[in-house]
Structure formats: C-alpha cells, structure tokens
C-alpha cells in the first residue's frame, strides 16, 4: 500500500510539473490580467475639434458590445477615454495619467496630429503601444525610429496627391486656392498636395492661407481666397472649420471645384451644419462605407452595424461616418488582442499589430488593412467620391496599394 501511495504521489508531482509550462505561457504587462485589459484613449470631447468626440463615443459603445458578448479571449476591455480639448499640453497631462496612474496596457486612437505629436516621444520612451492613432500624418509610419507608434487611416500626403492627380487630369489650368490649419496636420496635407502637383504647383496655386485652431471662424480667410480669382479650392480643415468654409463660400457666391479632406467628410457632423445645398458637388476621398449611401444599406455588414448602433449607441447619429469609423477601428484593435492571446505584453501587442492582413465589414469594397514589421500604414487605399445632396457617390478607380 505504501508503494502504491508513493507512486500516486510521484505521478501527481509529474502532472503538476507538466502543467507548469502551460501556466507559464500567460504573460502580462501592466494593464492586463486574467480578467481585464486596460485600454487608454484621449479624445477632444470639448474645444474646437469636439465633433471628433463622436469617434470616442462610438469606440466606447463598441467595447460595451464586446464585453456584453464575453470580452476578448474571456477578458473584459476597460476603455478609459479622457478629454484633452484638442490641446497638446492637456494631451501630455492625460497621457501621463493613463500610463502612469491608470497603468493602461496600451494607448489607442488618441485623436489629432498636434495632440499625438506632443506625446510621440513620450510613448516611445515609455515603450507603451501608441496604436492606430486617429490622424493620417505621414510620420506615424516610421517603425525604425518610433517602433511603438502606428497609424490606421490613409496618410494625409497620399490622400492629397489623389486630389492633385484628379485636378491635373480634369482641370490642368486650374487656379487653386488652399485653406489649411496651421499645424502639422495642415502642413502634411499641403506638402502632399504640392508634391502631387509637382512642377505645376507654383503656377496653379494662386493663394494659400492658413488659420489657427483657436480662431473663432475662417470667414476672413474665405473672403481673401475668393478674391484671389481661384476656380478650385482645396479645403484642409477640421470639422468645425470645414462647415464654416463651406457655408461662407455659399454666402459669398463663390462656386469653385471644391476638394475637402477626408477627415471632415461626415455628412451629419459637417455637411448638414454647413448646409446641404452649399455642400453639393464637393469631392473627397473615402475608405469606409458612408452610412447615408443606399448601396451599403443592405446585407449582413449593414445589419450588424445598425444593430450595434441601436443597442449600444442609440444616441449616435446614423448619418455620421464617425460612427462607422469608430466601429471599424475598434474591430481592428479587437483583432490585435485576439491574436495576442494570453501573451498580453506590450511587445507582443506591437508584434501582432504589425502582422495584420484583413478586411473589415465597413471598409469600402477593394480596401483592405495590412501591416508588416516595416509597414506601419494599415490602410492605404482610397476612392474619390462626390456629394450629391443626399450621400457621397463613389467614382473612378481605387488609389493606393
């Protein structure tokens, strides 16, 4: 009997020894446990770019959905979203709070080029994932120098080159006026546009005027741009100022060929406040499905988005593509977390973010999401579209790779 008891004890020890490696496979950095994943976010719920607050609310609602359905690999996502008012100094304060006090595993979708620029070095020094930032500045795709920061949407310079190509093809003798926000965001778009026009930039662009994000309106800039005699207008503005520019152009009776950067293309947040009639004919580039477009208001993808909006985000505007954006970018992070499995270290989060190859339900047909160790630009395809008074009408080819 003693021999049998000893044998059983030895067998039990052997089983425990065999189980140890399996238990050890779970790896966590701060912000992750068996039950929870802390995700930090900074969004302008107040201030001059508060229209973008819709994105943060949409993301939060999507994580409510994820958690209600069991979480990611059995873990709840704790989404902590703070307001910075689109003020870079406040962004720094909020980032420190999230990283050092809340101890989030990663930062996700912090919005705006100036705010993200203010914490760019901090996030990389701390080696905290600075993932899928809500800005298309070209500098977010630099894994060699900033391995902890990754963009999500198409980069601004590439988008601006699409508008330049369309102008050169359709109005080779255009007289172009440009309004841009005087910061990294505006200058990035402007550089891409000038590069896209090439040698013709100096002769085709007849007026370039900037505004400050603290300006109350861009009315005076619009008066000056009209006076330049331009027949083509590139509008590089955030939603509040985009709506003002569209409205003022109509008041002035100025009807140029109007190109609007994609970051302000939301029908609900921009075009409706600006005036539907005033917005007629505007051209922009898109990569996500416009919820006002009848061709996309059918099928499982639409039904799923609509069900999410009705159940988890009933206060959200069904005409606002910021709610499609938030839903889609949140799905991207969920995929990264799924791939990470039980290895929820910051290093593995970045490894998984840099190994994506997927499509998502509300991306435009032909647009995919792909990354690699040397490719931190997840979405690189866009298509031009024109506003017809009700919705954006897609036209032409898909640009990008």
Where are these regions (language model features)?
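Beta-alpha junction/loop-to-helix N-cap segments that form part of ligand/metal-binding clefts
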Residues: 25-28, 36, 51-57, 69-142, ...
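Extracytoplasmic "Venus flytrap"
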Residues: 28-36, 40-60, 82-89, 111-112, ...
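Periplasmic-binding protein-like
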Residues: 98-111, 131-133, 176-180, 229-239, ...
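Extracellular/periplasmic periplasmic-binding protein-like sensory domains
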Residues: 249-325, 398-400
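Sec/Tat signal peptide C-region and signal peptidase I cleavage site
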Residues: 18-24
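Segments of small-molecule ligand-sensing domains
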Residues: 311, 316-323, 334-392
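Extracellular/periplasmic Venus flytrap/periplasmic-binding protein
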Residues: 89-93, 100, 138-141, 146-252, ...
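Immediate post-signal peptide segment of exported/extracytoplasmic ligand-binding proteins
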Residues: 24-41, 68-76, 168-174, 343
């Amino acid at each position: 009997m003693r021999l049998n008891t000893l044998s059983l004890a030895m067998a039990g020890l052997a089983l425990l020894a065999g189980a140890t490696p399996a238990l050890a496979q779970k790896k966590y950095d701060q912000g992750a446990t068996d039950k929870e994943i802390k995700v930090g976010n900074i969004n302008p719920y107040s201030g001059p770019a508060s229209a973008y607050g819709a994105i943060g609310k949409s993301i939060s609602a999507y994580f409510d959905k994820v958690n209600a359905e069991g979480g990611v690999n059995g873990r709840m996502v704790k989404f902590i979203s703070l307001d910075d008012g689109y003020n870079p100094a406040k962004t720094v304060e909020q980032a420190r709070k999230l990283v050092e006090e809340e101890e989030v595993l990663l930062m996700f979708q912090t919005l705006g080029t100036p705010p993200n620029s203010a914490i760019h070095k901090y996030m990389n020094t701390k080696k905290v994932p600075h993932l899928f930032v809500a800005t298309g500045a070209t500098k977010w795709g630099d894994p060699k120098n900033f391995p902890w920061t990754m963009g999500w949407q198409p980069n601004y310079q590439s988008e601006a080159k699409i508008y330049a190509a369309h102008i050169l093809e359709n109005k080779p003798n255009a007289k172009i006026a440009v309004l841009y926000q005087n910061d990294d965001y505006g200058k990035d778009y402007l550089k891409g546009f000038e590069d896209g026009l090439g040698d013709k930039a100096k002769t085709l662009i007849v007026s370039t005027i900037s505004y400050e994000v603290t300006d109350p309106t861009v009315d005076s800039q619009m008066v000056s741009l009209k006076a330049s005699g331009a027949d083509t207008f590139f509008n590089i503005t955030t939603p509040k100022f985009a709506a003002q520019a569209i409205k003022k152009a109509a008041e002035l009776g100025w009807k140029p060929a109007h190109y609007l950067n994609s970051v302000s293309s939301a029908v609900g947040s921009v075009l409706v406040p600006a005036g539907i009639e005033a917005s007629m004919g505007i051209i922009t580039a898109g990569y996500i499905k416009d919820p006002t477009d009848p061709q996309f208001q059918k099928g499982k993808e639409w039904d799923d988005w609509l069900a999410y909006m009705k159940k988890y985000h009933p206060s959200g505007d069904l005409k606002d593509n910021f709610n499609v954006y938030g839903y889609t970018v949140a799905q991207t992070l969920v995929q990264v977390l799924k791939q990470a499995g039980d290895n929820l270290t910051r290093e593995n989060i970045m490894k998984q973010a840099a190994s994506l190859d997927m499509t998502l339900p509300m991306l435009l047909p032909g647009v995919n999401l792909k990354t690699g160790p040397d490719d931190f630009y997840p979405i690189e395809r866009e298509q031009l579209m024109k506003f017809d008074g009700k919705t954006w009408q897609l036209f032409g080819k898909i640009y990008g790779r």
